[in-house]
Amino acid sequence: MVKASANKSRRKVVTGLQVGSYVKVTDNSGAKVAMIIGVPGYHGRLRRIPPAGVGDMVVVTVKKGTPEMRHQVVRAIVVRQRKPFRRPDGTWVAFEDNAVVIVSEDGTPRGSEIRGPVAREAVERWPRIGNVASIVV
């Protein structure tokens, strides 16, 4: 039997990314392209590749960007994914690219602006991203 409080957990978004995925960095922190190397909090089966979706925090390594940012291991929030996911009202949402925003440990964005749209699911879970986002879809 499922407890009533168990239903209040976050909404499940279809995961369109995994460890090893290259993603676009959509803020002005200095990074351009990053690779996902971990998903904090994921406890899965042995040898299963951890998945990530919109609104999830991931650990990335910066592959392209300014010399200060390159080869750094930082945290990021997934704000867009190509894989379509369904919202509770029945609409399907898919973006043109897979994109992340680099953040600190507590979820504060490192950059001062976010280019392009940001999924509403990411803003609901990480409100500080919504303060810097130009468009929330």
From Swiss-Prot:
Subunit and partners: Part of the 50S ribosomal subunit. Forms a cluster with proteins L3 and L24e, part of which may contact the 16S rRNA in 2 intersubunit bridges.
NCBIfam families hit by this protein: PRK08571.1, uL14_arch
Recorded superkingdom: Archaea
SUPFAM superfamilies the UniProt entry points to: Ribosomal protein L14
Function: Binds to 23S rRNA. Forms part of two intersubunit bridges in the 70S ribosome.
Signal sequence, renumbered to the chain: none
UniProt xrefs under InterPro entries: Ribosomal_uL14, Ribosomal_uL14_arc, Ribosomal_uL14_CS, Ribosomal_uL14_sf
Gene behind this protein: rpl14
Gene Ontology MF: a single term: structural constituent of ribosome
Recorded family membership: Belongs to the universal ribosomal protein uL14 family.
Protein name, entry field: Large ribosomal subunit protein uL14
Any Pfam family: Ribosomal_L14
Keywords: Ribonucleoprotein, Ribosomal protein, RNA-binding, rRNA-binding
GO cellular component terms, A-Z: cytosolic large ribosomal subunit
Native species: Ignicoccus hospitalis (strain KIN4/I / DSM 18386 / JCM 14125)
